[in-house]
Amino acid sequence: MSKKQRLSEEDGEVEIELDLGLSLNGRFGVDPLAKTRLMRSTSVLDLVVNDRSGLSRTCSLPVETEEEWRKRKELQSLRRLEAKRKRSEKQRKHKACGGEEKVVEEGSIGSSGSGSSGLSEVDTLLPPVQATTNKSVETSPSSAQSQPENLGKEASQNIIEDMPFVSTTGDGPNGKKINGFLYRYRKGEEVRIVCVCHGSFLSPAEFVKHAGGGDVAHPLKHIVVNPSPFL
């Protein structure tokens, strides 16, 4: 057990501990330099306590811009799906129809004369379209490599047969030869000729005028079918 005794001095009251410990200053439990020592100061005012809260997510784009980017991506994906659906529907309709597209059918033929004379002129102008049939033929490995080339040639020939090359020469003072090809059309549609020099869709009467000719009663008589340079 330790006892404490209070003594009055000039500096004030000093608390002395009486125990069995040794003291180098001659007085038990008294440190004469206790009041002269400086208090330790620190540059840190308060201790920083980390509450370990989750860090906020950072990104290179603002929040609004990121939301707009996501919406744009969703719209693009929806447009792609819509385009794929339309292509599949077109292919399905084309297969259902069997690809039946006639180059010459009854309909309005530009600004030509009567319907009966116009139809007879178109029939004499265009070559007959041959129907292509698919035949299963056993091929060797060497001939199998040439199948893509043959298919490409057949496709180009079918296109050329459907859209033959035509030309006309104007009989006016500024007459010149104009080349083009007959653009395929369906039943009830107007005959159109694509001008090679400008890429314009013209009626037979406009095609003759484009070559420098005047107004003619039967413009199809002035248009000549030429052999294709690709055959």
UniProtKB/Swiss-Prot annotation:
UniProt keyword Nucleus, yes or no: yes
Stated induction or repression of this protein's expression: Up-regulated by abscisic acid (ABA), glucose and salt.
Region (Disordered): 83-152
InterPro entries, alphabetized: Ninja_fam, Ninja_motif, NLS_NINJA_AFP-like, TDBD
Keyword Transmembrane helix appears in the UniProt entry: no
A GO CC annotation given for this chain: nucleus
Pfam families reported for this sequence: EAR, NLS_NINJA_AFP, TDBD
S-S bonds: none
Keywords, sorted A to Z: Nucleus
Localization terms from the record: Nucleus
Residue stretches of biased makeup (Basic residues): 83-96
Domain of life: Eukaryota
Signal peptide: none
A biological-process GO annotation: signal transduction
Biased composition, class Polar residues, residue ranges: 130-152
Effects seen without this gene: Exhibits hypersensitivity to salt and slight hypersensitivity to glucose abscisic acid (ABA).
Purpose of the protein: Acts as a negative regulator of abscisic acid (ABA) response and stress responses.
Protein family (similarity comment): Belongs to the Ninja family.
The protein's assembly and partners: Forms a heterodimer with AFP2. Interacts with ABI5/DPBF1, DPBF2, AREB3/DPBF3, EEL/DPBF4, ABF1, ABF3/DPBF5 and ABF4/AREB2.
Name of the molecule in the record: Ninja-family protein AFP3
